[in-house]
A protein has these predicted regions:
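Extended alpha-helical targeting/anchoring segments
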Residues: 1-318
Length: 318
């Protein structure tokens, strides 16, 4: 993480309102287990690694193609030293443009035709073991050790189609604000989410806790009924309030004193299949801190850990 911080500081991108917000830089992921490099209390626990992928992997993107779906416009961007490499940048842009104009070989990205049922998925936990972990978590809550914890399990399934087909299916069936497809040679990452971990823009920090979910209604009346059921559910409200407080505490670790505020509370966001309850926490980051400091303060999201966060993650490891 220190290396990434130093690398980021070595780049000074010129802001241009005509360019997309992302115009080059690091693209990749931090896995959940990166928390062991951040929190000392979790450094020595080591659950088995069942998939054998790196804890973090990033690509430095110095040649970027950004397609604006709304404007039907393609941006080609090259990162170079503005003073000394302008002619080289133009040459690379020409090469990239020529490459994009070449015809592509035919590839079948259609989704596989076979039918998949829930029974085809393989759990890394097992039903009885998972139920036992839930009961144990409830005991911790009753004893006052934690307020909430997110029990989860990995589900796996053999997949023979092209990962692009999976990404396209997700875009069609369950589009979300944040969707991703990463081809990392040895493996691919495909997914979608309505949620950010944190955002840093012009010194302004934003986190958006999401907790509370209902299905979309069959019609407008049913949809509104689902919304009312969610916002009047004491369990959903209690969980959401805990995550707002967790977000405030996380952001407060790197924020200017007195700058943390909740700018939206219990908002409703609707997606293709579900609706969520969402709040917004904002602050101003301290002048001597960076995006990596913000990451360390907020990772992982409370929605995949619990509250208090560190104790909840100790219980997840257990």
């Amino acid at each position: 993480m220190d290396f990434i911080d130093k690398l980021q500081q070595s780049y000074n991108l010129i802001e241009d309102p005509n360019l997309p917000k992302f115009n080059g830089g690091l693209v990749g992921y931090f896995a959940y287990d990166c928390i062991r490099y951040i929190e000392d209390r979790l450094a020595h626990s080591s659950p088995p690694d069942t998939i054998g992928t790196p804890d973090a992997l990033f690509m430095l993107s110095e040649e970027v193609a950004v397609f604006d779906n709304l404007k039907n416009k393609l941006h080609l961007i090259i990162l170079v030293d503005a003073e000394n490499q302008k002619s080289e940048a133009n040459e690379r842009l020409d090469e990239l443009e020529d490459k994009l104009k070449q015809p592509l070989p035919f590839e079948d990205f259609s989704a596989p035709k076979e039918t998949i049922s829930e029974s085809d998925f393989i759990s890394g936990f097992g039903e009885s073991e998972f139920k036992h972990s839930v009961e144990k978590a409830k005991t911790y809550i009753e004893e006052g050790d934690i307020m909430q914890v997110v029990c989860s399990q990995r589900m796996s399934l053999p997949f023979t189609a092209d990962p692009v087909a999976l990404y396209r299916s997700i875009r069609q069936l369950n589009p979300s604000p944040y969707m991703y497809y990463l081809n990392l040679e040895d493996f691919h990452i495909v997914g979608s989410s309505p949620e950010i971990l944190a955002r840093l823009e012009d010194k302004k920090v934003t986190v958006r806790p999401i907790a509370g979910t209902r299905r979309r209604g069959k019609d407008e009346k049913d949809d509104l009924a689902m919304e009312q059921d969610m916002v009047n559910d004491p369990k959903e409200i209690a969980e959401h309030l805990k995550l707002i407080e967790l977000g405030r505490n996380d952001v407060g670790r790197i924020a200017e004193p007195g700058s943390v505020e909740v700018t939206e509370k219990f908002g409703i966001e609707r997606y293709s299949h579900v609706m969520h309850m969402v709040s917004n926490v904002e602050a101003k980051i301290k002048d001597n801190l960076s995006a990596i400091d913000l990451f360390r303060a907020t990772f992982p999201a409370g929605t995949v850990s619990g509250a208090p966060k560190i104790r909840a993650m100790e219980i997840i490891d257990e």
